[in-house]
Amino acid sequence: GGMRQRVVISLALAAQPKLIIADEPTTALDVSIQAQIIQLLKKLGREHGTAVMLVTHDMGVIAETADRVAVMYAGRIAEIGPVAEVIHHPQHPYTIGLMGAIPSVGDYNERLAQIEGSMPRLTAIPAGCAFNPRCTRVNDVPGQRCTTERPGLLPAGKTRAACWLHATDNAAAHTKVPA
């Protein structure tokens, strides 16, 4: 198990890249092989001075390997920041719902939380915040901003969130993603 991933990683490093983008590198692998592949990516990244960007839905992998995380919704960054902050103190309503949907270890009687509604088609993203049709906080923002204006990434605690709940004034609407 994991031999294909190892071969692809080796081929990628042969070109001496500054960045490796690993899209779901551990999907369909058992936990022990998954850990080996992640450790290999980290080790080779350090040895070769190569940055590794993981694209994954597995928050466990993110928690174990990444320094920073960008949570995306409908093709846009909803929240970005240090992994521990985003996981333990999420600021965007989508990130809050996402973290709440992760089952607790050992609590078999707990009902899994879910985010009501469904993702929009990427060809039909709603005006304003793409999450607004599903957001439980949409009415907490004055002036219908969530449904009319797309928010930029706004300071939100130790992260940045694309959410009008964190706007201090109207001028904060269009900030850029930090490097």
Where are the model-predicted features located?
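Short amphipathic alpha-helical "recognition" segments used for binding
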Residues: 9, 38-40, 147
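ABC ATPase nucleotide-binding domain "signature motif"
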Residues: 1-5
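Short catalytic/signature loops enriched in Gly
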Residues: 80-179
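P-loop NTP-binding/switch modules centered on Walker-like glycine-rich loops
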Residues: 16-17, 21-25, 29-111
